[in-house]
């Protein structure tokens, strides 16, 4: 069972997935810092509040923390944009597969088609 697990985990796809998850986690930390430490203060300068995550409004007993939601939206948009550009780059670098044309029909296929056509004409 241990041997099977080693074979499973060392296959190419699993290793690619593991590397992707690790890099994704590190990238998320970078994007979070970018949004929190650079983008939010810039937006805060325009709206008069430096810390967007504390933006909220209250209706009765309910408090709506829309600042945290704005942070999450900004994080998502940045990550989506970077993933979009990475996919475009990979598609540009990866060689395109050529579409295989159907091979020419063999003599046998030609004869069978002729027989089929003759039988169809005869049965009309």
Curated annotation (Swiss-Prot):
UniProt keyword terms in alphabetical order: Cell membrane, Ion channel, Ion transport, Membrane, Transmembrane, Transmembrane helix, Transport
Recorded topology in the membrane: Multi-pass membrane protein
GO molecular-function terms, A-Z: mechanosensitive monoatomic ion channel activity
Residue spans crossing the bilayer: 15-35, 67-87
Covalent S-S links between cysteines: none
Main location: membrane
Cell compartments where the protein resides: Cell membrane
Residue ranges that the Swiss-Prot or TrEMBL entry lists as coiled coil: none
CC terms in the record's Gene Ontology section: plasma membrane
SUPFAM superfamilies to which the protein is assigned, alphabetical: Gated mechanosensitive channel
Protein family per UniProt: Belongs to the MscL family.
Subunit structure: Homopentamer.
Function: Channel that opens in response to stretch forces in the membrane lipid bilayer. May participate in the regulation of osmotic pressure changes within the cell.
UniProt name for this protein: Large-conductance mechanosensitive channel
Gene name as annotated: mscL
